[in-house]
């Protein structure tokens, strides 16, 4: 089975990341912040006939090549691929967020986040939440 590869440098350029890339918490935090500052949450495709494709190559083309944003499944999906290419151990999981204005949780499977394992510790990473209160660094 062929391992998918991406142009990692092009992705790092897209998010404006410069400097050393290593499998560390400090690097993960910087990658997360740079991604959030450069790639917007957007759901413009909901208003078109464009079919959502969640394969790595399609997400990369949308976010990196075409300089678009996306929703949580697209943003976290593409970011997980970048992290894997850099050597991080990543799991993709379903999540629910709490909406304080409505006083309730969102629907099950309505959100997607990443779990990154570093030195036997697990960190929640989310670059795909369209809200100002989105965590800007990994949460242990």
Model-derived regions: residue spans:
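Generic preference for flexible, low-structure residues
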Residues: 27-28, 44-47, 51, 55-60, ...
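Hydrophobic/aromatic-rich core segments of domains that either
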Residues: 77, 81-140
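Secondary-structure boundary elements
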Residues: 2-67
């Amino acid at each position: 089975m062929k391992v998918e590869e991406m142009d990692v440098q092009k992705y790092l350029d897209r998010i404006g990341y410069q400097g050393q890339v290593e499998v560390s918490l400090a690097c993960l935090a910087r990658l997360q912040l740079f991604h959030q500052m450069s790639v917007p949450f957007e759901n413009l495709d909901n208003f078109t006939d464009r079919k959502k494709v969640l394969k790595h190559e399609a997400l990369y083309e949308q976010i990196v090549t075409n300089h678009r944003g996306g929703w949580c499944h697209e943003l976290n999906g593409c970011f997980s691929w970048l992290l894997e290419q850099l050597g991080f151990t990543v799991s993709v999981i379903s999540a629910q967020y709490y909406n304080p204005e409505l006083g309730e949780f969102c629907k099950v499977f309505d959100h997607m986040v990443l779990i990154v394992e570093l030195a036997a510790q697990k960190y929640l990473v989310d670059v795909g939440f369209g809200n100002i209160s989105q965590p800007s660094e990994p949460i242990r």
